Amino acid sequence: MRNFLTIWFRELSACFLSPVAYVLMVVFLAVTSATFLLDITQDAALDQPLTVTLFESILVWLTILVTVVCMRLFAEEKRSGTLETLMTVPVTEAQIVLGKYAGALSFLLLVTFPVAITLLLVVAVSPVLQLGDLDGGALLSGGLILILVSSLLVAVGLLVSLLTRNQIIAAICCFCAVWGVLLF
C-alpha cells in the first residue's frame, strides 16, 4: 500500500510542479464556461434542460483534457528509460499502474474542480437571469456521472499510453480511443 501511495503522490506532484497544471485549469474553466454561456444564449439550448447543456459542454472539452493528462503517463517513462528503473524497485506492476491511474485521475478531478464552483454560481444566479429551475438531483447525478466518465476515460488513456512510446502518438491514439468509447 505504501508503494501505491508513493507512486500516486509522485505522479500528482509531478503534474503540479510545472505551470502546465495551472494553465490547464484556467483554460479548461474558461473554455467550458464560454461554451456553456454561448449555448444558453442561443435559442436552441432553451429546448433542453439547463443541466443537459452544462454537462454536454463539459464532456466535449473533457476529452481533450484527458488526452493531455494521459499522454505522458507511461509513454514518457518509456521514452526516458525510467520505466525499467521503476520496475527494478520492489513494487508490483499493479501498484505502478494503479498509482499512475490514481495520480492522473486525482489531477484530472482537481483541474475540473473549478467547474463545480461554476455550477454553484449558475445555481445562485439562475433565478435572477430567469434560466429556469435547476434540479438539484440532476446536478448531483450529473456531477457523479462526470466523475465516473472521467474515471473511464483516464483508464482508456492509461491503456493507450502503455501501448505507445511517443507522447504525440499517445495523444492522438488516446483522443481517438476516448471518442470511440464515448460514441459507442
Show which residues each predicted segment covers.
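Hydrophobic alpha-helical membrane-insertion segments
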Residues: P19, I96, A102-T112, C173-F184
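Long, hydrophobic alpha-helical segments
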Residues: L54-E76
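Residue-level signal for the membrane-embedded core of alpha-helical transmembrane segments
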Residues: V27, I58-V66, L109, F113, ...
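Transmembrane helix segments
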Residues: V27, L38, T164-F184
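Secretory targeting signals
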Residues: T35-L37, A44, Q48-V52, E56, ...
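Transmembrane helix-loop junction
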Residues: R10, A14, E76, V89, ...
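Aromatic- and glycine-rich beta-strand/loop motifs that create alpha-glucan
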Residues: M1-M25
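Helix-loop-helix units of permease transmembrane domains in multi-pass membrane transporters
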Residues: L73-L105
